[in-house]
């Protein structure tokens, strides 16, 4: 009997033993190619020496000091390092312990910004359907995945949702890419006007929608128009880069590839590359100064925020990304992975779309290519693909509910930045085999 309250109470999981590079090994010695980084976490693979060394050095100095009493060299260095790779108006980093905490902090920061600015009536959040922003109550409230929200709706703060920017599903045949971008973005303006601009404080979005929809990038011009709308109606733009940030998309942050900058940006997952739990909210000068020049106190906090060892791990992670030129590697291997996925899978009758940026890919499964009808829920495609992939020595991240939280299936891929060409061959080969084996059960 296990005394652990596992997320699936009746699951029988292999016991992890060790990690080396892009591979994980269980207690029986079985080797798994990590093609998803757990959940887009393990940017540097497993057992990276520079990160382990930085953590050990910090442990030998001091493992923990509460931020109500001390700051630390590692947290100061991390905040500085993050800001060095941000646009010039981002100069303050709030350090927490994970993605949900980062989003919760950003939501409260947005609220306090307007309270400090003399606009306490601004209290409504707008986000997007099929978004995912975390599992804590505030983050779940702005999230747009109905399956995750449903049991907890009675205790969620009311939030409002518009359609996602999801070209494969919603761009019409007669629309140009820009035309679709503007139509999708203008839903935000319509929702703001419906609620009253004086009541809306922030719009929350993932630049690349991650787990719930499968690496869905925005179309060209979408976020440029979103930024214009936010500016027009005095609404903060919060971008959630918990999954797509810190190099995953091929740039340090995904919004760098858009024509828009946020007011607050959240990051986590790859920030510590899985070596320690850590997250961050980066505030632009406008938001920070409103609080600093007002009460001077952000009314929020957690015991383990800015944890010295976690910060040391994150410093080493970011330094490694830039010193080893891993963003170049991400973009180079992205092209190879896209080509191999397309060659091996695109012709299959159940592959609807292969999409993504950097080393962040989604493969959407369908019952019919022309109509884009989803696979039946009865196929249990996500569960069966995950199980069979593990049997084949591959870790990928299949999910159900791609379209609306109930219907649709996709596979998310987010391999480590250190992945080599022969690993990509192995990844695509094992994934192709897995899909062909599982597809036999759909007939």
Where are these regions (language model features)?
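Conserved N-terminal phosphate-binding loop of PLP-dependent enzymes in the Aspartate aminotransferase
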Residues: 1-443
